[in-house]
């Protein structure tokens, strides 16, 4: 029977000093025999997805204590990618993922905590905490802050989100008054941005991995139903502790739950719902932390057989996360995958003995449980607020239309090709990724002339100055994990291409990455990156590039001999941008770049460089 990790600091005469300090935090004699459960919160007033989390850690703490545990809360950092976007602040976004993972490890191991409740929400916070959970391999449960309500305005017939505000701002035909109206309406409440962007994608994937409760990814941040997720998480983590430490049941550990098959389930969900390409980066990183042999080739294999069963903004304007919830949430998509014979349903979760059991209970098309149906009727109130659980609006009906609704059956899929694809070719030998859910079918095969930019900043200037023409393939390089450093998101370039009417007339390829809000023929994560000697660094203005999504290929139309000659020349010059970039790279960013791998490895640290230390 495994001992509580916390015994290291709570038991024995020699630990009198440590116990004295524990007592100073409020612990009593009887508490030293209970599991100490860390609550990793991520409250900050910088991020709308986290602004409402301040008191939620203590909400969970009280529930843990009622269930027989001791709760100790700490906080991690959280970067808002939307606010950091378009300037050097974005250099810090992806590196913050590693900082968050390390912070959770530091706090949990330094204080010998027995289990963790991860209160996450936005883009790098959920991945960072997931990496830490799999690294530590002690009982864990995830509960996120929830998605934002979609914005509403009389100037648009559809719900609004952050991307709408960005696109309209760059549209020279839009009046200042219209831009101001979109700005004020796009992000009305607390919560993670309302589309299937990176934050919501990752929170949905924690359900598929089996590490979060049903509804975690789709229940609105403002809705009263979300409070029950936090309370249930508090009770559940104590039960997981009892099963592991009291019954020697290691099936409750994160590496037992989030195994190879679970990663396949998560990736199949991602492909089926057209999630953010960033999820690929984060799943690969989490798999490495959990020592799961899941890589880009597995994602490529799955992308060829999973259809697109759900379409949400930014891939379609009609639906946002509140609509996914009304259609039954993630377990309804998982149910469709299961009935299609793709999902691994024999896996345990933190809340059910198997995924099959969970689907039977939570898929609205499979259950007659009125409580479940009521749960998925939770909807938006349309009242601007920064307060969690502040409304209890419900839809009158569910969206259980699997032929024409938000979530589809296999027979009525949006497309038989899934929403994400991996492309290989001489310009990206180790692969690159594209969100096919956001690409118009008319440009699934696209040949164009390369238009080279050595940074995101110069690309933005070029697009706004009309230097990019229809038929161009915009190449933005030296923006990978090492080259940026930090692998910036390219939401502004793609948004500006849209505003210039080039969304279906151009492509964009980068060794950087894209926001979950990106759509269009936007191909990222080109590996190896330019700074690591990748062929994207050998492309020249005017070179022909052929993109062929159906055949999963992307190739520079240049001979092998010419590429070899260019490589010799570039080796002499050094793999760095051809222009000086006015970019302040701090010591912290240099340290990140020193160990960073390319995107095909999840942009994690190169552990080989640390061997022997």
Curated annotation (Swiss-Prot):
The modification N6-carboxylysine is found at residue 124. It is an enzyme of class 4 (lyase). Mg(2+) binds at residues 81, 123-124, 489. Pathway: Amino-acid biosynthesis; L-isoleucine biosynthesis; L-isoleucine from 2-oxobutanoate: step 3/4; Amino-acid biosynthesis; L-valine biosynthesis; L-valine from pyruvate: step 3/4. The gene is ilvD. Homodimer. It holds the Pfam family ILVD_EDD_N. This is Dihydroxy-acid dehydratase. [2Fe-2S] cluster binds at residues 122, 193. One of its GO terms (biological process) is isoleucine biosynthetic process. It comes from Pseudomonas putida (strain W619). Its cofactor is [2Fe-2S] cluster; Mg(2+). The lineage of its organism: Bacteria, Pseudomonadati, Pseudomonadota, Gammaproteobacteria, Pseudomonadales. Its EC number is 4.2.1.9.
């Amino acid at each position: 029977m495994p001992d509580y990790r916390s015994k290291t600091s709570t038991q024995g005469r020699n630990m009198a000093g440590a116990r004295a300090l524990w007592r100073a935090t409020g612990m009593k004699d009887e508490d030293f025999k209970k599991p100490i459960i860390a609550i990793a919160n991520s409250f900050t007033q910088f991020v709308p997805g986290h602004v409402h989390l301040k008191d939620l850690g203590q909400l969970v703490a009280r529930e843990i204590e009622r269930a027989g545990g001791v709760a100790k809360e700490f906080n991690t950092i959280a970067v808002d990618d939307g606010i950091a976007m378009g300037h050097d602040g974005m250099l810090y976004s992806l590196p913050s993922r590693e900082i968050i993972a390390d912070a959770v490890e530091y706090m949990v191991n330094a204080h010998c905590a027995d289990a963790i409740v991860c209160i996450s929400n936005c883009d790098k916070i959920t991945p960072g905490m997931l990496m830490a959970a799999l690294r530590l391999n002690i009982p864990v449960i995830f509960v996120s802050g929830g998605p934002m309500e979609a914005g509403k305005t009389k100037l648009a017939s559809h719900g609004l989100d952050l991307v709408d505000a960005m696109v309209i701002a760059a549209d020279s035909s839009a009046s200042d008054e219209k831009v101001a109206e979109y700005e004020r309406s796009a992000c009305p409440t607390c919560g993670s941005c309302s589309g299937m962007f990176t934050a919501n994608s990752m929170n949905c994937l924690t359900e598929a991995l089996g590490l979060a409760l049903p509804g975690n990814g789709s229940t609105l941040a403002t809705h009263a139903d979300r409070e029950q997720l936090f309370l249930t998480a508090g009770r559940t983590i104590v039960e997981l502790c009892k099963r592991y430490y009291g019954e020697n049941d290691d099936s409750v550990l994160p590496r037992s739950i989030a195994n190879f098959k679970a990663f396949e389930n998560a990736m199949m969900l991602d492909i089926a719902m057209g999630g953010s390409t960033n999820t690929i980066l984060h799943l690969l990183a989490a798999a490495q932390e959990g020592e799961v042999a899941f890589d880009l080739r597995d994602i490529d294999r799955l992308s060829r057989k999973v259809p697109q069963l759900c379409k949400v903004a930014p891939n379609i304007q009609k639906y946002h996360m509140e609509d996914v919830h009304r259609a039954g949430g993630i377990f309804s998509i998982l149910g469709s995958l299961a009935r299609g014979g793709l999902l691994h349903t024999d896996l345990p979760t933190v809340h059910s003995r198997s995924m099959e059991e969970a689907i039977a209970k939570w898929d609205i098309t499979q259950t007659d449980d009125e409580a479940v149906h009521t749960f998925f009727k939770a909807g938006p109130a349309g009242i601007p607020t920064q307060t969690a659980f502040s409304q209890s609006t419900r839809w009158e009906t569910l969206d259980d239309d699997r032929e024409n609704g938000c979530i589809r059956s296999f027979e009525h899929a949006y497309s038989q090709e899934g929403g994400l694809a991996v492309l290989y070719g001489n310009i990206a030998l180790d692969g690159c990724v594209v969100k096919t859910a956001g690409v118009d079918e008319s440009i699934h095969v696209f040949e164009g002339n390369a238009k080279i930019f050595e940074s995101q900043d110069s690309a933005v200037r070029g697009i706004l100055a009309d230097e990019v023409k229809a038929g161009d393939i915009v190449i933005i390089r030296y923006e990978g994990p090492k080259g940026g450093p930090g692998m910036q998101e390219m939401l502004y370039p793609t948004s500006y291409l849209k505003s210039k009417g080039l969304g279906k007339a151009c492509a964009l390829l980068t060794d950087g990455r894209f926001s979950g809000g990106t759509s269009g023929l936007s191909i990222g994560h080109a590996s190896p990156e330019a700074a690591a000697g990748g062929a994207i660094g050998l492309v020249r203005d005017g070179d022909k590039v052929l993109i062929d999504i159906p055949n999963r290929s992307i190739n520079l139309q240049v001979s092998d001999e010419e590429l070899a000659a260019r490589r010799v020349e570039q080796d002499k010059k050094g793999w760095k941008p051809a222009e000086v970039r006015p970019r302040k790279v701090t010591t912290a960013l240099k340290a990140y770049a020193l160990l960073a791998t390319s995107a095909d490895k999840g942009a994690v640290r190169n552990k080989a460089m640390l061997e022997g230390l």
